[in-house]
Swiss-Prot record:
It catalyses: dideacetyl astellolide A + acetyl-CoA = 14-deacetyl astellolide A + CoA; dideacetyl astellolide B + acetyl-CoA = 14-deacetyl astellolide B + CoA. Its EC number is 2.3.1.-. It comes from Aspergillus oryzae (strain ATCC 42149 / RIB 40) (Yellow koji mold). Pathway: Secondary metabolite biosynthesis; terpenoid biosynthesis. Disruption phenotype: Impairs the production of deacetyl astellolides A and B and leads to the accumulation of dideacetyl astellolides A and B. This is O-acetyltransferase astG.
């Protein structure tokens, strides 16, 4: 683990550089019978993983290119001081980590590596693992530098590490040369013609036109970290039923919209033939949280001059031409950000038919269903617009900016990354087996929520981690 790993520096893409210098930090919890043997397998697995992907042992390094006025980032071989600590740290605890057969004892930040913020002016590790060995189990704390890896890439690395922990893993499916070539491909994916899209409202300048003098304070922005989180569980079957009900209602809403607003522009009149479960789930959350934030007057409804804005991650790997590999580790997620008037979130009247003899609860149920459907339809339209042209437009904007730009999360009332697709709970680590639970650290800001990875097994519920500021 202490060997120096060499690789050629990898230049990061504009999408990597539009990410703040923070770490994605999570904790995986395992119930283990033979802890010593599991730790030995883990050490071998980490060493094998770094041999296959040596850049994971490196650092994110900031620099300025000749003739350029803005900071750039690249992945470089580790410094001697950083490498001496090793990528994997093992800490032994002479106590139990499990409260009962299913629940683990509360953890703390001492169980995960690194701090949430990387120091931009200094080389910062790309990847670190901390193994906490207990009498009855192991918890693995991971830290991934977000400039180098997005959440999808994080899931790929965890699955790959699990594969290397099992005895005699097959040849690696991941290739360092592909990582380098793909980041260059993204950098070259400029728009061939003017798209007419303005991204300036979504990104903010993160520094002065020239780097600060040596020894001066860094100008990079910080992110407020929430001090409280709450986890909510939603049955998968209930969400599937809600999605199907919304899809059935789409033609009715489309017809009603055309009748009430015959002069709508083309994007607003575009039919949405289907909705994903994620669309409907985010719509449900957006409706509930917006109505909690705004007071509704009995006569006038919600305030007509207020808007609520959401941003949600859209994985662009399969949406661009040529498509990127699903196993690409770098940042390939763009934030979809748009706002709606808060009156969109009131109960929607969906029919003019007589309601005589109809139960009032059924009427109210249908009206709220229509509201959720209407919001989900707006979300799906936004996601559908995230295509190859949009991707190239964003890359061009970031490349042409005279200074570094970061996506402006502060403009959003709600921020929704979805990790549902990550196969973390499916990762078999050999002696450790599959993770029993997962904890996410550093959920930023009030109104930020994360849709957690799907548990192993059929009909796994949807889990939501909601970030709240203390009152």
């Amino acid at each position: 683990m202490g060997e120096q790993t060499e690789f050629e520096p990898i230049q990061l893409s504009p999408l990597d550089q539009a990410i703040p210098p923070v770490y994605i930090r999570i904790l995986l919890c395992f119930s283990v019978v033979n802890v010593d043997r599991a730790i030995s397998q883990l050490q071998t697995g980490v060493s094998s993983l770094l041999s296959a992907l040596p850049f994971l042992s490196g650092d994110v390094v900031r620099y300025t290119a000749p003739g350029k006025t803005k900071w750039l980032y690249q992945l470089c071989p580790p410094t001697h001081q950083v490498q001496a600590t090793g990528v994997l740290v093992v800490k032994h605890h002479q106590m139990r980590c499990m409260v009962d057969e299913k629940r683990f004892a509360p953890s703390s930040t001492s169980h995960i590596p690194l701090s949430p913020f990387a120091e931009p002016a200094r080389p910062a590790p790309i990847f670190r693992v901390q193994a906490n060995a207990y009498i009855d189990g192991i918890t693995l704390g991971f830290a991934f530098h977000h400039i180098a890896v997005d959440a999808t890439g994080m899931g790929v690395i965890i699955s790959e590490l699990a594969r290397h922990c099992r005895s005699s893993p097959p040849p690696s499916l991941l290739c360092p040369d592909y990582e380098r070539a793909t980041r260059q491909l993204i950098s070259n994916s400029r728009a061939t013609e003017c798209s007419g899209l303005d991204h300036s409202g979504d990104y903010i300048s993160c520094q002065a036109l020239s780097p600060p003098a040596e020894g001066s304070e860094d100008a990079s922005p910080s992110i407020e970290i929430s001090t409280e989180t709450r986890t909510f569980v939603f049955p998968a079957a209930r969400l599937e039923s809600l999605k199907n009900a919304c899809i059935e209602m789409l033609p009715t809403l489309d017809q009603q919209q055309r009748q009430q607003n015959p002069c709508l522009d083309e994007p607003a009149r575009t039919k949405v033939p289907w909705l994903s479960t994620n669309d409907v789930f985010v719509a449900l959350l957006w409706v509930c949280l917006t109505r909690c934030r705004y007071q509704e007057d009995q006569n006038s409804g919600l305030p007509s001059d207020e808007h609520t804005r959401i941003c949600m991650g859209v994985n662009m790997r399969s949406r661009i031409q040529p498509p990127l590999s699903a196993d690409y580790l770098g940042n390939a997620i763009l934030s979809l950000s748009f706002k709606l008037n808060v009156n969109v979130f009131r109960r929607t009247q969906v029919t003019n038919e007589s309601i005589e003899g109809v139960d009032s609860k059924d009427i109210e149920h249908k009206q709220w269903l229509a509201t959720i459907c209407r919001v989900a339809r707006n979300i799906r339209r936004g996601v559908n617009g995230m295509d190859d042209s949009y991707f190239r437009s964003v890359v061009s904007f970031l490349e042409d900016s005279s200074d570094c730009r970061l996506f402006d999360y502060a403009r959003c009332d709600f921020c929704v990354p979805s990790w549902r697709h990550l196969c973390v709970y499916h990762a078999d680590f050999g002696e450790m087996g599959r993770p029993k639970s997962l904890e996410v650290f550093d959920v930023p800001g009030d109104g930020s929520f994360c849709i957690l990875p799907q548990h192993y097994g059929a009909a796994a519920p949807w889990e939501l981690l909601l970030g709240l500021l203390k009152a």
